[in-house]
A protein has these predicted regions:
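Conserved class I S-adenosyl-L-methionine
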Residues: 1-49
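A short acidic, Gly/Pro-enriched loop at the edge of an enzyme's catalytic core
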Residues: 102-109
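C-terminal lobe and adjacent flexible extensions of AdoMet/dcAdoMet transferase-like proteins
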Residues: 206-254
Length: 254
């Protein structure tokens, strides 16, 4: 049986199995190193586009008060199931898109990991997301996010990737549009049912190849300062062949 659904619905149940090589612990360690550099002590954190909540739960286990948002109800269901096993204070999960961010109270740090910002394909949505993050950061607070680089997304044009687990098979077909500066992922997911039969679902994802100049301009227009762009999990400038950029920016102290 084949069914077409919107992004991160069918994939939600298999997402953790398909991303076992992400290295969440290393990324959490990196985030904490950045938090320690902040002149404002970081205790409250926003995890924007949190997915299945792995990073949000890791930070909660380390003592942070975490608010986590995502646009996919299915991903949030997985996240809340994961958080239910915590002995520490669990994250507060909110069902929101990035450009419609609205929190209960400001935070000292905001993160957006695993290239979620590249899912913002329209300049207006990118600008509004940055504006809202700025609005919900305390003065002196920090925004840290990563993106897939234009070099990586162009290199993915007309490629086929496969991920396989015991109960699922995921096939990704990718196409890059120079005109739109976007990479489209056509995803076929096959999941085995208890009776041995297989269900097939289709999702289409799209990411924008934002340039460094576009990101810096959008951050500046939102009010951010001290913008820094580095390679992945490092303090050095990115290489020309970098797959991922990490960007940090600060809301000025008022």
């Amino acid at each position: 049986m084949q069914e077409e659904v919107s992004r991160y619905q069918a994939l939600a149940a298999s997402y953790d199995e398909l991303t076992v090589d992400v290295g969440y612990l290393r990324r959490a360690d990196y985030l904490e190193r950045q938090f320690r550099k902040s002149p404002v002590p970081v205790r409250t954190v926003l995890d924007l586009a949190c997915g299945t909540g792995t990073m949000a739960c890791l930070l909660a286990k380390r003592g942070y008060e975490v608010t986590a948002t995502d646009a996919s109800e299915e991903m949030l269901t997985q996240a809340m199931t994961k958080a239910a096993a915590l002995t520490e204070r669990p994250p507060l999960f909110l069902h929101q898109t990035m450009p419609r961010l609205r929190l209960l109270e400001p935070v000292v740090a905001a993160i957006c990991t695993l290239e979620a910002v590249t899912y913002l394909t329209r300049p207006a949505d990118l600008q509004e997301t940055f504006r809202r993050v700025f609005r919900w950061l305390r003065p002196g607070g920090w925004f840290l996010f990563d993106v897939n680089t234009p070099w990586k997304l162009r290199r993915m044009d007309r490629q086929i990737y496969m991920d396989e687990t015991e109960e699922s098979l995921c096939v990704w077909r990718t196409f890059f549009s120079e005109k739109r500066q976007t990479c489209t992922y056509q995803v076929d997911l096959f999941r085995q049912r208890a009776d041995g039969a297989w269900d097939r679902s289709f999702e289409e994802h799209r990411e924008r190849a934002w340039t460094e100049e576009e990101l810096r301009q959008a951050l500046a227009e939102a009010g951010f300062t001290a913008v820094k762009l580095t390679g992945d999990l490092t303090s050095r400038p990115p290489k020309p062949t970098e797959d991922r950029w990490i960007i940090t920016a600060q809301r000025p102290v008022e």
